[in-house]
Each structure stands twice: as C-alpha cells, then as structure tokens.
A protein has these predicted regions:
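N-proximal low-complexity "stem/linker" segments adjacent to membrane-targeting elements
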Residues: 1-54
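Short aromatic/hydrophobic "clamp" motif used to bind/position activated sugar donors
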Residues: 97
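The conserved acidic donor/metal-binding loop of glycosyltransferases
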Residues: 101-105
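Conserved donor NDP-sugar-binding/catalytic core segment of glycosyltransferases
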Residues: 108-138, 208
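Active-site-adjacent helix/loop segment of glycosyltransferases
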Residues: 200-201, 206-265, 274-355, 362
Length: 375
C-alpha cells in the first residue's frame, strides 16, 4: 500500500478504505463505459449559461424564458435543481447517471477515471474536481478522498456528480424541499445508507465563475442558508470547528491571554502522544501533535470568518482582544474573507428561519487518553 502497488482484496484493505485512510487508484474500468452513463443537466431559468439541448444528454428546462428548444422535460419556474435532477432520473435507464450543471464544462475523457470506481459494487457516487474561481468552495483540491461528514472532504458540490442509479433510488434521490444544500444532504444520506462516496481529482471539470462580486456574494450567502436545515437533518455533521479537549483548551487559554497555560497544554499534550505511539519516533509524534494544534488554529480562524464573525464583531466593540481575533482571522486568508463573510450572513439568516444555533456550535471530542467510565 505504501508503495502504491496493487494489493489483493482483504478485510484490512476494506477497513482502511472504509475509514478513508487509503484511497483506491483503480485501473481504467472494464465493466462500464460511457454508454452506461446518461448525462442529466438542469437548465434553470436564471442560469448564466445554457447548454445545447439535443446533444445526447437529458435536459431539464426549469422555467426558462423563452423555453429551451429540445428540452427533454419542462418544469415550472418554482422548481429547483433537486426537483430537476429527480425528474431527469425518471427518464434514465442506464446503470449510472452523471448530473452536470449547465454552467459546467466537461472535457473529453472526463468520465473514464470516475467510471473505474464503479467496478466496486459498494461505490454509490464519485465526483470530479471542480475548477474555476480561485479559492472557490467548489474546488476541493488535488488529493483523493472518501466523502463523509466531519472528514477532510465532507461534501462535494452538485455541479458534477456521477451516481449509481441503484444507490440514487435507494435513498430516494435529492430532497426537493431544499433550495440549497440538496447536494450535501444527498451525499450524506448515501453515506449513511452504507454506500461509499468518493472524490476523484484525476477527473476535472470547469465551473463558470460568477460574473460580479455581487453575484458571488449572493451565491455564497445562498450556500449559507442551507446550513441550519442540514444541521437539523444531520446532527453534529456541520460543526464549524472540530477539536479535542487539549487543543481546544490551549487555544481558548491563548485567546484569553493566558500564554503560559496555553503553551504548557500544547507542549505537554504533544509530548504525551509519544508513549501512545511506541513504533513512531518521539520527535515525529511531537511534530505531528504540534501540527495538529496549528491546524486547529487555522480552522478556528476560518470559523471566525465564516460563521462566528457576528459574535466576534459584537465582542470587538468592547474588547481589544476580540478586535485582534477578528483581524487575525481575516489576515489568515484575506482572499476568501469576503465570500466567507457572505456565507456566514446566509448561515445566520438560516438559523433565524429555523430557530436553531446548531450551525455555529463546535464539536469538541473527549480528552485524548480518557475513556468514558462504564455505567
């Protein structure tokens, strides 16, 4: 496995794949070809670009004016992307369905790396890398991953997805009551039903960026409005910050000005990791733990920009320390700060609508080394 050489199937390999510790690099498929896939494209009334109906794909016209010539199905303007994708599924008879939005450009051969994964019958969905706008939340990077709530790649955008038809039917498709976040909800329900979902950046597609900052703000705020509904449907899955008790205490102490206790906690917990990993050199385990502390700090800064900024902003009115926190969070990623703040605006709108604080509550795990006492 370490040398990226072929390995025989085994229970250990299955456990590692299931945990997302390793990722498959399958040979090009011998089971499925592009003829086993039907492309479904919702053409929304407000789409910034359009596709040519009649190019072999199933095109769902959602309230276009004038109507899209050659569309397979027409829906009223009140429909959304979830309803359009579900309608497209009703006329598909292939084993796989590729849902591709109208503002996404694909390249020749983009399906081949994705279809190779479907040789594994446990695979329900695979998504390509979506490139386009710099620092876009749609671009999830160059590393393959298992998609699972709370993991490194906890979601994939619905801009381009290839889904096994049987998996789609088992979970009932997309939830048409969700105007935003229906793609995240769909992937999480597939995972909860036992289907593996994978992110495969060996395949890339291009997503047309929004044309103005105003459109980008509206787009990101729209994404944010889905957070409350998703947090209620999938408790704990949308926590803005995840940490263990030692790391959380160290950062809270530092922000409170208690530099000494923060340093002792961070260094002490890093040193304590060594005896728990006897096969790893102490220096390596120490560096690993310290990197974990630093990574948690970056994630906390991202949470300030994205969902905690109203709280930090109020605190900054009366506290110099809160003002420093706000400045540090913005400087940590200056480029994404405007769209992060727009996303947070949407999150708070959704929280008000659904009357819940769930999207801004962090998840702090048990203190490392401590196990719950049996009842």
């Amino acid at each position: 496995i370490e040398q990226c050489e072929p390995v025989a199937p085994s229970s250990l390999v299955t456990r590692l794949l299931d945990a997302g510790a390793v990722h498959p690099a399958p040979d090009r498929t011998t089971t499925f070809t592009e003829s086993d896939v039907t492309v479904v494209t919702p053409q929304l009334r407000t789409s910034p670009s359009s596709v040519a109906a009649g190019d072999g794909r199933v095109t769902i016209d959602v309230g276009s004016a004038p109507p899209l010539a050659g569309a397979t199905i027409r829906l009223p303007a009140t429909g959304g992307p979830a309803a359009a994708r579900n309608a497209g599924r009703s006329v598909v008879d292939t084993d796989q369905i590729a849902f591709v939005d109208a503002d996404v450009e694909t390249t020749e051969g983009w399906l081949e790396p994705l279809l190779a994964h479907f040789d594994d019958p446990r695979l329900g969905l695979v998504a390509p890398r979506v490139t386009g706008e710099r620092a876009s939340p749609l671009d999830l990077g160059a590393e393959a991953a298992r998609i699972r709530a709370g993991s490194r790649v906890s979601y994939v955008p619905g801009a381009a997805l290839v889904v096994r038809a049987a998996a789609f039917d088992e979970v009932g498709g997309f939830d048409a009551t969700l105007r935003f976040g229906e793609d995240v909800d769909f992937v999480w329900r597939l995972d909860e039903a036992g289907w593996w979902c994978r992110y495969e950046p060996a395949s890339t597609v291009w997503h047309e960026p929004r044309r103005s900052w105003r459109e980008r703000f509206r787009q990101h705020a729209g994404y944010g409005t889905s957070a409350a509904a998703l947090a209620l449907r999938h408790p704990g899955a949308l926590a803005p910050w995840r940490s263990n008790g030692w790391t959380a205490f160290a950062w809270v102490a530092l922000l409170a000005g208690a530099v000494g206790p923060a340093a002792v906690t961070a260094l002490g917990s890093a040193a304590a990791l060594g005896p728990k990993l006897p096969d790893v050199p102490r220096s390596a385990s120490f560096r690993l733990a310290m990197r974990g502390h630093l990574f948690a700090g970056r994630e906390a800064a991202a949470s300030v920009r994205r969902v905690w900024w109203p709280i930090v902003g109020v605190g900054a009115i009366v506290s110099k320390r809160f003002r420093w926190v706000a400045v540090a969070a913005v400087l940590a990623d200056l480029r994404s700060a405007p769209t992060d703040i727009a996303y947070g605006w949407g999150v708070w709108q959704g929280m008000r609508r659904h009357r819940t604080w769930a999207p801004i509550i962090p998840a702090v795990s048990a203190w490392p080394g401590r196990t719950p006492r049996p009842e």
